[in-house]
Protein backbone atom coordinates (compact mmCIF):
# COMPACT_ATOMS: atom_id res chain seq x y z
CA UNK A 1 0.00 0.00 0.00
CA UNK A 2 1.04 3.57 -0.60
CA UNK A 3 1.37 4.39 3.09
CA UNK A 4 3.11 7.71 2.44
CA UNK A 5 0.14 9.02 0.43
CA UNK A 6 -2.36 7.67 2.93
CA UNK A 7 -0.41 9.30 5.77
CA UNK A 8 -0.36 12.62 3.92
CA UNK A 9 -4.15 12.54 3.53
CA UNK A 10 -4.63 11.67 7.20
CA UNK A 11 -2.22 14.34 8.37
CA UNK A 12 -3.89 16.97 6.19
CA UNK A 13 -6.98 16.40 8.35
CA UNK A 14 -4.97 16.15 11.58
CA UNK A 15 -5.82 12.45 11.90
CA UNK A 16 -3.14 10.00 13.09
CA UNK A 17 -2.57 6.91 10.96
CA UNK A 18 -2.38 3.47 12.58
CA UNK A 19 -0.85 0.72 10.42
CA UNK A 20 -0.90 -3.03 11.04
CA UNK A 21 2.51 -3.94 9.63
CA UNK A 22 2.50 -7.55 10.75
CA UNK A 23 5.15 -8.74 8.32
CA UNK A 24 7.30 -5.60 8.47
CA UNK A 25 9.14 -5.68 11.79
CA UNK A 26 12.43 -5.98 9.89
CA UNK A 27 11.93 -2.59 8.19
CA UNK A 28 14.30 -0.87 10.59
CA UNK A 29 16.36 2.29 9.97
CA UNK A 30 19.63 0.39 9.56
CA UNK A 31 18.01 -2.19 7.23
CA UNK A 32 17.74 0.24 4.32
CA UNK A 33 21.38 -0.15 3.38
CA UNK A 34 20.84 -3.91 2.99
CA UNK A 35 17.85 -3.59 0.65
CA UNK A 36 14.88 -3.12 2.98
CA UNK A 37 13.97 0.49 2.31
CA UNK A 38 10.65 1.96 3.29
CA UNK A 39 8.17 0.51 5.72
CA UNK A 40 5.30 2.20 7.51
CA UNK A 41 7.47 4.11 9.98
CA UNK A 42 9.60 5.63 7.22
CA UNK A 43 6.41 6.40 5.26
CA UNK A 44 5.12 8.59 8.09
CA UNK A 45 2.54 6.42 9.87
CA UNK A 46 1.94 7.62 13.42
CA UNK A 47 1.42 4.27 15.12
CA UNK A 48 2.73 1.02 13.66
CA UNK A 49 2.09 -2.46 15.02
CA UNK A 50 4.83 -4.89 13.96
CA UNK A 51 4.77 -8.62 14.67
CA UNK A 52 8.29 -9.21 15.88
CA UNK A 53 7.83 -12.97 15.87
CA UNK A 54 7.37 -13.16 12.09
CA UNK A 55 10.78 -11.94 10.92
CA UNK A 56 12.79 -11.24 14.08
CA UNK A 57 14.01 -13.47 16.95
CA UNK A 58 11.05 -13.19 19.30
CA UNK A 59 8.45 -15.60 20.61
CA UNK A 60 5.11 -16.10 18.87
CA UNK A 61 2.46 -13.51 19.83
CA UNK A 62 5.02 -10.77 20.46
CA UNK A 63 4.73 -7.43 18.70
CA UNK A 64 6.04 -3.88 18.87
CA UNK A 65 3.89 -0.75 18.88
CA UNK A 66 5.99 1.99 17.31
CA UNK A 67 5.11 5.63 17.99
CA UNK A 68 6.21 7.95 15.24
CA UNK A 69 5.73 11.69 14.81
CA UNK A 70 3.70 14.06 16.94
CA UNK A 71 0.05 13.26 16.20
CA UNK A 72 -0.10 10.23 18.49
CA UNK A 73 -0.06 11.36 22.13
CA UNK A 74 2.16 8.92 24.06
CA UNK A 75 0.21 9.48 27.28
CA UNK A 76 -3.09 8.72 25.55
CA UNK A 77 -1.63 5.65 23.87
CA UNK A 78 -0.44 4.38 27.25
CA UNK A 79 -3.86 5.06 28.78
CA UNK A 80 -5.60 3.12 26.02
CA UNK A 81 -3.17 0.24 26.40
CA UNK A 82 -4.02 0.11 30.10
CA UNK A 83 -7.69 -0.17 29.11
CA UNK A 84 -7.38 -2.82 26.40
CA UNK A 85 -4.34 -4.86 27.38
CA UNK A 86 -4.32 -7.52 30.03
CA UNK A 87 -3.27 -6.63 33.55
CA UNK A 88 -1.44 -9.97 33.72
CA UNK A 89 1.06 -9.89 30.85
CA UNK A 90 3.24 -12.83 29.93
CA UNK A 91 6.68 -12.04 31.26
CA UNK A 92 8.38 -14.65 29.05
CA UNK A 93 6.94 -12.78 26.05
CA UNK A 94 8.11 -9.42 27.41
CA UNK A 95 11.58 -10.81 28.08
CA UNK A 96 11.59 -12.19 24.54
CA UNK A 97 10.94 -8.70 23.13
CA UNK A 98 13.71 -7.25 25.30
CA UNK A 99 16.05 -9.95 24.05
CA UNK A 100 15.05 -9.14 20.47
CA UNK A 101 15.85 -5.44 20.86
CA UNK A 102 19.15 -6.27 22.57
CA UNK A 103 20.05 -8.57 19.67
CA UNK A 104 19.15 -5.91 17.11
CA UNK A 105 21.32 -3.35 18.89
CA UNK A 106 24.29 -5.70 19.21
CA UNK A 107 24.17 -7.79 16.02
CA UNK A 108 21.40 -6.36 13.85
CA UNK A 109 23.43 -4.73 11.04
CA UNK A 110 25.81 -7.69 10.74
CA UNK A 111 22.90 -10.16 10.75
CA UNK A 112 21.07 -8.21 8.05
CA UNK A 113 24.23 -8.11 5.95
CA UNK A 114 24.50 -11.90 6.23
CA UNK A 115 20.80 -12.20 5.36
CA UNK A 116 21.35 -10.19 2.18
CA UNK A 117 24.34 -12.36 1.25
CA UNK A 118 22.29 -15.53 1.71
CA UNK A 119 19.49 -14.18 -0.47
CA UNK A 120 21.91 -13.20 -3.23
CA UNK A 121 23.50 -16.64 -3.09
CA UNK A 122 20.04 -18.20 -3.31
CA UNK A 123 19.19 -16.06 -6.34
CA UNK A 124 22.30 -17.25 -8.13
CA UNK A 125 21.56 -20.87 -7.19
CA UNK A 126 18.06 -20.86 -8.72
CA UNK A 127 19.03 -19.04 -11.91
CA UNK A 128 19.23 -22.31 -13.86
CA UNK A 129 15.77 -23.62 -12.94
CA UNK A 130 13.83 -24.50 -16.10
CA UNK A 131 10.28 -25.20 -14.96
CA UNK A 132 9.87 -23.22 -11.73
CA UNK A 133 9.39 -19.48 -11.50
CA UNK A 134 10.87 -17.83 -8.41
CA UNK A 135 9.51 -14.30 -8.32
CA UNK A 136 12.27 -11.65 -8.42
CA UNK A 137 15.03 -14.24 -7.97
CA UNK A 138 17.19 -16.13 -10.42
CA UNK A 139 16.19 -15.35 -14.00
CA UNK A 140 13.22 -13.27 -12.81
CA UNK A 141 14.13 -9.72 -11.78
CA UNK A 142 12.20 -7.01 -9.99
CA UNK A 143 12.68 -4.87 -13.11
CA UNK A 144 10.51 -7.40 -14.98
CA UNK A 145 7.53 -6.29 -12.89
CA UNK A 146 7.07 -2.54 -13.39
CA UNK A 147 3.56 -2.74 -11.93
CA UNK A 148 4.87 -3.84 -8.52
CA UNK A 149 4.42 -1.02 -6.02
CA UNK A 150 7.01 -2.48 -3.64
CA UNK A 151 8.82 -5.74 -3.03
CA UNK A 152 10.15 -7.38 0.13
CA UNK A 153 13.09 -9.50 -0.98
CA UNK A 154 12.96 -11.44 2.29
CA UNK A 155 9.83 -13.19 1.05
CA UNK A 156 10.28 -15.74 -1.72
CA UNK A 157 7.23 -16.37 -3.92
CA UNK A 158 7.42 -19.72 -5.70
CA UNK A 159 5.01 -20.73 -8.45
CA UNK A 160 4.98 -24.45 -7.68
CA UNK A 161 1.40 -25.10 -6.55
CA UNK A 162 0.15 -27.35 -3.77
CA UNK A 163 2.12 -30.35 -5.05
CA UNK A 164 5.32 -28.34 -4.92
CA UNK A 165 4.46 -27.16 -1.42
CA UNK A 166 4.08 -30.77 -0.33
CA UNK A 167 7.50 -31.49 -1.85
CA UNK A 168 8.95 -28.61 0.19
CA UNK A 169 7.45 -30.03 3.38
CA UNK A 170 8.99 -33.41 2.61
CA UNK A 171 12.31 -31.59 2.30
CA UNK A 172 11.94 -29.93 5.69
CA UNK A 173 10.47 -26.55 4.70
CA UNK A 174 7.05 -25.33 5.86
CA UNK A 175 5.62 -22.63 3.56
CA UNK A 176 4.01 -19.56 5.06
CA UNK A 177 1.17 -19.68 2.53
CA UNK A 178 -0.12 -21.87 -0.29
CA UNK A 179 -2.70 -20.34 -2.62
CA UNK A 180 -3.25 -21.82 -6.05
CA UNK A 181 0.01 -21.72 -7.98
CA UNK A 182 1.69 -19.46 -5.42
CA UNK A 183 3.71 -20.71 -2.47
CA UNK A 184 5.27 -18.17 -0.10
CA UNK A 185 8.53 -18.94 1.68
CA UNK A 186 9.46 -16.64 4.54
CA UNK A 187 13.08 -15.86 5.36
CA UNK A 188 14.59 -13.85 8.19
CA UNK A 189 17.96 -12.61 9.46
CA UNK A 190 17.92 -15.53 11.90
CA UNK A 191 17.84 -18.33 9.34
CA UNK A 192 20.48 -21.01 9.44
CA UNK A 193 23.49 -20.12 7.30
CA UNK A 194 22.76 -22.90 4.81
CA UNK A 195 18.94 -22.90 4.95
CA UNK A 196 18.53 -21.09 1.63
CA UNK A 197 21.18 -23.30 0.03
CA UNK A 198 19.09 -26.32 1.01
CA UNK A 199 15.92 -24.64 -0.26
CA UNK A 200 17.60 -24.14 -3.64
CA UNK A 201 18.57 -27.83 -3.69
CA UNK A 202 14.99 -28.92 -2.94
CA UNK A 203 13.69 -26.65 -5.71
CA UNK A 204 16.16 -28.17 -8.17
CA UNK A 205 14.94 -31.66 -7.24
CA UNK A 206 11.33 -30.55 -7.81
CA UNK A 207 12.30 -28.84 -11.06
CA UNK A 208 13.70 -32.14 -12.34
CA UNK A 209 11.01 -34.38 -10.82
CA UNK A 210 8.94 -36.43 -13.28
CA UNK A 211 5.99 -36.11 -10.87
CA UNK A 212 6.05 -32.33 -11.07
CA UNK A 213 2.64 -30.99 -12.11
CA UNK A 214 2.20 -27.51 -13.49
CA UNK A 215 0.08 -25.49 -11.02
CA UNK A 216 -3.43 -24.55 -12.08
CA UNK A 217 -3.89 -21.02 -13.39
CA UNK A 218 -5.52 -18.62 -10.90
CA UNK A 219 -8.79 -18.49 -12.88
CA UNK A 220 -9.40 -22.15 -12.03
CA UNK A 221 -8.96 -21.82 -8.28
CA UNK A 222 -12.46 -20.83 -7.20
CA UNK A 223 -15.88 -20.82 -8.85
CA UNK A 224 -17.57 -17.52 -9.56
CA UNK A 225 -19.31 -16.20 -6.43
CA UNK A 226 -23.08 -16.61 -6.25
CA UNK A 227 -25.69 -14.32 -4.76
CA UNK A 228 -25.47 -13.77 -1.00
CA UNK A 229 -28.46 -15.17 0.90
CA UNK A 230 -27.49 -13.64 4.25
CA UNK A 231 -24.96 -11.27 5.76
CA UNK A 232 -21.71 -12.44 7.33
CA UNK A 233 -23.08 -11.58 10.77
CA UNK A 234 -26.20 -13.68 10.14
CA UNK A 235 -24.08 -16.58 8.91
CA UNK A 236 -21.99 -16.37 12.08
CA UNK A 237 -24.85 -16.12 14.58
CA UNK A 238 -27.52 -18.38 13.09
CA UNK A 239 -27.75 -22.07 14.03
CA UNK A 240 -25.53 -24.10 11.71
CA UNK A 241 -24.52 -27.63 10.82
CA UNK A 242 -21.53 -28.98 8.94
CA UNK A 243 -21.96 -30.52 5.51
CA UNK A 244 -19.54 -31.76 2.87
CA UNK A 245 -18.35 -29.51 0.07
CA UNK A 246 -20.26 -31.63 -2.46
CA UNK A 247 -23.52 -30.76 -0.68
CA UNK A 248 -22.78 -27.05 -0.28
What is each stretch, according to the model?
Residues 1-136:
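Conserved PLP-enzyme active-site core in the AAT-like
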Amino acid sequence: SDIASIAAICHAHNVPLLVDEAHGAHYLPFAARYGWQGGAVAAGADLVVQSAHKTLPSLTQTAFLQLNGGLADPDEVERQLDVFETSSPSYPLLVSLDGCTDWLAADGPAAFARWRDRLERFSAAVADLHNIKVMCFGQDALADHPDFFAHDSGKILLQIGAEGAAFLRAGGFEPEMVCGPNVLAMTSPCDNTHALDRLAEVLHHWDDSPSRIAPAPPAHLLPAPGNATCTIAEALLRPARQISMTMA
